[in-house]
Regions:
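Short, aromatic/basic amphipathic alpha-helical patches
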Residues: 10-19, 151-157
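Flexible active-site lid/hinge loop adjacent to a nucleotide/diphosphate
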Residues: 1-13, 21, 25-28, 36
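Acidic-glycine-rich active-site phosphate/pyrophosphate-binding loop
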Residues: 18-35, 74-80
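C-terminal helical cap/extension that packs against the catalytic core
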Residues: 26, 30, 126-182
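Nucleotide phosphate-binding/pyrophosphate-handling subdomain across enzymes
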Residues: 35-137
């Protein structure tokens, strides 16, 4: 028998497979019979972890959270570093596209974020990222060849921003302001 694990919006798509639909991570956790707090991963990796457990549940009728938690995420993928004075810096330099940056922002949406953005966007529209930043507590530090474009978008979306040109300038500016309850995110 074939099985399809799909987001709820696709549950009614015609298929011969048995459909397991989920709305969010909580739905998958219920299907797997696990507690979300027992899983070592956070957004955006939490959904992937739960999908892996769901496949294990389907194939072997078990969900080994302890084994799952031994998996190590590659360096520079939302890698949290706590510096002296208890301040959190997040290295997400593997986020090479808009979607990855959006997921990083979602992970820290409940914190004030000092967000370093920039580089060569290769002409890709950044509007979707800025749409996701609206309403969040965030300040942008624009670096790289597209820093002027980022500053214009920040103004358009009414998001505080500082043009820093290079990474070291952005880090220095953030270091002056970063509080222990806030996040410095390089994405």
């Amino acid at each position: 028998t074939s099985v399809a694990i799909v987001p709820e919006i696709y549950a009614k798509t015609p298929t011969k497979a048995k459909v397991i639909a989920y709305k969010d991570e909580s739905d998958l956790a219920r299907f797997c019979g696990v507690n979300l707090d027992d899983i070592a991963f956070k957004t955006p990796f939490l959904l992937d972890a739960l999908l892996a457990l769901a496949v294990e549940k389907i194939l072997f009728d078990r969900c080994d959270v302890a084994l799952l938690n031994t998996f190590v995420i590659e360096a520079n993928k939302l890698e949290e570093l706590t510096a002296k004075m208890g301040r959190t810096w997040v290295n997400d330099t593997k986020a090479t596209n808009i979607d990855a940056s959006i997921q990083a922002v979602k992970r820290y949406k409940d914190h004030f974020m000092h967000l370093i953005l920039g580089g060569d966007d290769k002409g890709v529209s950044m509007d979707e990222l800025f749409e996701n930043l609206k309403g969040l507590k965030v300040k942008i530090y624009a670096i790289g060849s597209n820093s002027e474009k980022l500053m214009n978008l920040a103004a358009k979306f009414n998001i505080p921003a500082l043009k820093c040109e290079i990474l070291q300038n952005a880090v220095n500016e953030i270091a002056k302001e970063l509080k222990t309850s806030e996040i410095a995110l390089l994405s």
